[in-house]
A protein has these predicted regions:
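Short, flexible beta-strand-to-coil junctions
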Residues: 1, 70-76, 126-127
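Long, contiguous N-terminal structural blocks used for assembly/anchoring
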Residues: 1-69
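Short acidic, glycine/tyrosine-flanked loop/strand segments centered on an H-E-D-like triad
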Residues: 91-101
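Acidic, proline/glycine-rich low-complexity IDRs
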Residues: 104-130
Length: 131
């Protein structure tokens, strides 16, 4: 017997994940190209939000922008996208995976660079690929 549990992930939790992962937890595998930054800044100018780590989520959630995420070792290679179209299904996949502890830590406000990295990988790639 299986019981399906759905959890609401507040925007504030998603913001914290983006801040922690983009400012350190995930920088060993991802790269934001100048094109990605341009896409983000066209949706959310610096005058609205000067921090890229929070502007990226605003661009995705508020302006339905799809942000390409590149490989840090091959800056030309797009390895995934941060998109409102895939965000829910990918976070649900995380909630149903062996890595769900990372999401639970974030929801309990006990997240760190490791848990944020795992959640961010699911948000962008749909699975843990790095680390």
């Amino acid at each position: 017997m299986e019981i399906k549990i759905e959890t609401i992930v507040p925007r504030e939790v998603l913001e914290n994940i983006c801040i922690t992962s983009l400012e350190g937890g995930s920088n060993y595998w991802y790269y934001l190209s100048s094109n990605a930054i341009k896409i983000i800044r066209n949706a959310v100018p610096k005058s609205v939000d000067s921090y890229l780590s929070t502007a990226i989520l605003k661009a995705v959630l508020d302006h339905n922008v799809e942000v390409p995420i590149n490989d840090v070792e091959d800056e030309e290679e797009i390895i995934g996208y941060l998109s409102s179209k895939t965000l829910q299904e990918r976070i649900q996949a995380l909630a149903n995976s062996d890595d769900s502890w990372a999401l639970h830590n974030e929801l309990k406000e006990e997240g760190d660079a490791s848990s944020s990295d795992i959640v961010f990988q699911y948000m962008v790639l749909g699975e843990v690929v790095y680390g």
